[in-house]
Amino acid sequence: PYYSNGAGFHLLLDDIQDPGNLGAILRTHAAAGNKFVFLSKGCCDLWSPKVIRGSQGTQFSLICYQQEDLALLIDRLEFSVFSLGMQGESVLNRKFDQNIAFILGNEGRGISSTLLKKSDQMLSIPMIKNVESLNVGVAASIVIYEHARQFLFQQSL
């Protein structure tokens, strides 16, 4: 498996169950110019027809690893690892380094406690009070494009 420290935004997906969500996340990740995706044991199948349909086949342009031990991967990465949850600094206020990893969790349970402990910082997406949470695909899009806004799009202006 890939354990070097390639450049860019590394997406770590913890037990994502819905193929539609996974497809949307992959499509967004590729659209923002990113390459690396790591799926934990328990994630839905990267190659299922519904994931391929939802991603529009973008997993063919990504470097994807399935059945990964994300805790071991985090131990080997040499850059910041963020998690997304309900508490923490707003992702919109955080100045990112170009090379980061971001953990997104299961649709119902969120990120496992093991991975939360390994995260350098939890960030949140600001929402009005009567909205409990966002769909993981929507949340991923916000995080991915905030990182892209700070690097990819600034460099191309």
Predicted regions mapped to residue ranges:
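RNA substrate-binding interface of SAM-dependent RNA methyltransferases
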Residues: 1-89
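Intrinsically disordered, low-complexity regions enriched in small/polar residues
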Residues: 4-5, 11, 49, 62, ...
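Weak global preference for isoleucine
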Residues: 16, 25, 37, 52, ...
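Structured adenosyl-cofactor binding patch, chiefly the S-adenosyl-L-methionine
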Residues: 30-32, 43-60, 113-157
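Glycine-rich loops and low-complexity Gly/Arg-rich segments
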Residues: 35-39, 61-65, 87-90, 106-110, ...
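Compositionally biased amphipathic helical and low-complexity segments enriched in hydrophobic
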Residues: 71-74, 78, 93, 117, ...
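Active-site/ligand-binding-proximal alpha/beta "capping" segment
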Residues: 82-131
